[in-house]
């Protein structure tokens, strides 16, 4: 789910923390990718027709493999170095959110049956996406494929996006890539969205800078977490009716949730019973993650025969097509001779542009007295 309304809040009150980048601008970037979230997305959209998912001759779902294979090769061709991180066991506090998702999925399944009886194809298309389940087998299959493609792979002890953030904070990757905005709550220095979007959509990568975010909102990390809890997160309920704008206003005014609760009109804004906001803070501040001390990341050339044996031998993909895609990758990475190889493994530069619906506030002042983030000055040197 992420954080409700956070993207718009940042666009309005800290636009300097956001910038668009071309996909090709991530040349030589090492990026930790929330693979579990993207598997779910691929199973919803790749090869889907009505309620039918992409399957092989044996009836096994292959949407996740097709999606990950295609997107991974696109990144490798562009000189991007992905690291795939998969969800481990969800934190106990997420149980309530997971139960809600289960209820919604079951309600969608019931509504889907009615839509099929009525022959409503539009409803069938919409509701079938809400019934998608990602199994342990699906994740293990993508892990296997990623390893055959020569990528570093991790199964996080808990939330994948928390480990992505930890890898970024340790300087092992340039950014964490996820569509979930709660990745910022784990204080990842950089968050990249749209990295796995299909090339046909021509979406630029939307990059968030955490330091500029805090500067733009004039908040500490602790205060930002409190704002996100009030907006609505996966770990606990929020106070209904407050919303993102008031959440920012009240935390800036009262300092933290405790200060807000002392002044809040509880008849207008009823506080959830036994509200575990303090426990939610701990999960964001001290999550279970892969240990990064002494950790090194290694990429190798794809094992073509292993990829073919798995995708074609086990999953009935078209061998000619898979070999052609792998040959195209090899060609792309060697194009231009030695100069191209040096570019892939060496340094480069990108041009940045500020993104936001509103202009940067004058003299560094935003709403509620918040200082606007500084605009980028153009060229940024690569570090990873």
Curated annotation (Swiss-Prot):
Enzyme Commission numbers on file: 3.1.-.-
First-level EC class: hydrolase
Cofactor comment text: Binds 2 magnesium ions per subunit. They probably participate in the reaction catalyzed by the enzyme. May bind an additional third magnesium ion after substrate binding.
Keyword RNA-binding: no
Region Disordered, annotated ranges: 353-384
UniProt GO molecular function: 5'-3' exonuclease activity; 5'-flap endonuclease activity; DNA binding; magnesium ion binding
Region: I-domain, residue numbers: 123-254
Keyword Metal-binding in record: yes
Family classification: Belongs to the XPG/RAD2 endonuclease family. FEN1 subfamily.
Protein task: Structure-specific nuclease with 5'-flap endonuclease and 5'-3' exonuclease activities involved in DNA replication and repair. During DNA replication, cleaves the 5'-overhanging flap structure that is generated by displacement synthesis when DNA polymerase encounters the 5'-end of a downstream Okazaki fragment. It enters the flap from the 5'-end and then tracks to cleave the flap base, leaving a nick for ligation. Also involved in the long patch base excision repair (LP-BER) pathway, by cleaving within the apurinic/apyrimidinic (AP) site-terminated flap.
Protein name per the record: Flap endonuclease 1
Organism: Micromonas commoda (strain RCC299 / NOUM17 / CCMP2709) (Picoplanktonic green alga)
């Amino acid at each position: 789910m992420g954080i409700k309304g956070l993207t718009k809040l940042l666009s309005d009150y800290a636009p300097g923390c956001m910038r668009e980048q071309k996909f090709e601008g991530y040349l030589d970037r090492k990026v930790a990718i929330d693979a579990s979230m993207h598997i779910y997305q691929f199973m919803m959209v790749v090869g889907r027709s009505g309620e039918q998912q992409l399957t092989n001759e044996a009836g096994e779902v292959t949407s996740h493999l097709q999606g990950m294979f295609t997107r991974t090769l696109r990144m490798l061709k562009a000189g991007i170095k992905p690291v795939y991180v998969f969800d481990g066991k969800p934190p106990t506090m997420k149980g309530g959110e997971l139960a809600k998702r289960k209820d919604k999925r079951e309600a969608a399944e019931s509504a889907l049956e009615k839509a099929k009886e009525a022959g409503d194809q539009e409803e069938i298309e919409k509701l079938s996406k809400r019934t998608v389940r990602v199994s342990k087998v699906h994740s293990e299959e993508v892990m296997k494929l990623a390893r055959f493609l020569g990528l570093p792979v991790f199964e996080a002890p808990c939330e994948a996006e928390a480990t992505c953030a930890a890898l970024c904070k340790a300087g092992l990757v340039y950014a964490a890539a996820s569509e979930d905005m709660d990745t910022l709550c784990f204080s990842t220095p950089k968050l990249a969205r749209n990295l796995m979007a299909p090339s046909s959509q021509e979406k630029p990568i939307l990059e968030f800078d955490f330091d500029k975010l805090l500067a733009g909102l004039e908040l500490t990390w602790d205060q930002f977490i409190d704002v996100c809890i009030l907006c609505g997160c996966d770990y606990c309920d929020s106070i209904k009716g407050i919303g993102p704008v008031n959440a920012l206003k009240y935390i800036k005014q009262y300092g933290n949730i405790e200060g807000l609760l002392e002044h809040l009109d509880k008849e207008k804004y009823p506080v959830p019973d036994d509200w575990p906001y303090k426990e939610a803070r701990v999960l964001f501040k001290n999550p279970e993650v892969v240990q990064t001390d002494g950790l090194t990341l290694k990429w190798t050339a794809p094992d073509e025969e292993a990829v073919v044996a798995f995708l074609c031998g086990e999953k009935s993909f078209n061998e000619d097509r898979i070999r052609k895609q792998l040959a195209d990758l090899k060609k792309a990475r060697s194009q231009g001779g030695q100069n191209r190889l040096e570019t892939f493994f060496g340094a480069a530069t990108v041009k940045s542009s500020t993104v936001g619906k509103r202009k940067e506030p004058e003299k560094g002042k935003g709403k509620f007295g918040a200082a606007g983030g500084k605009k980028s000055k153009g060229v940024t040197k690569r570090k990873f």
